[in-house]
Amino acid sequence: MDVEQAIPLLRIFSVEKAREFYLDYLGFVVDWEHRFDSTAPLYMQVSRAGLVLHLTEHHGDCCPGSTVFVRATGLLDFHAELHSRDYPYLRPGIEHAPWGADTLELTDPFGNRLRFNEYGGATGG
């Protein structure tokens, strides 16, 4: 078996809040959206810099409060980009984690966490 890609599913409860957080604040783009009909829950794929996420309003797809562990580079630039945006609900910092990575953790409006990790030093740690 060869694994091509793992795509986390994250539960959302408001399309408006999800768009504000993932698109406007984090800079993801919508790759596609799906609804079974005009009143059905939304299922959409968003991506940025190789990170692909599926955001779902569907009950039973997944539980809120998940954590996605992301290995990345350019954490300092990403941190500066986030702080340049007018998003009043988060002002994340970068911390050196016990597992040896510099870490920037974000919690979305639905309790899901994105934990961005840079090994070898965003902050020289």
Where are these regions (language model features)?
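Conserved beta-strand segments that form the floor/walls of ligand-binding pockets within enzyme
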Residues: I7, R11, H54, E105, ...
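Conserved beta-strand-loop-alpha-helix junction that forms the acyl-donor binding cleft
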Residues: R11-V15, F36-T39, P98
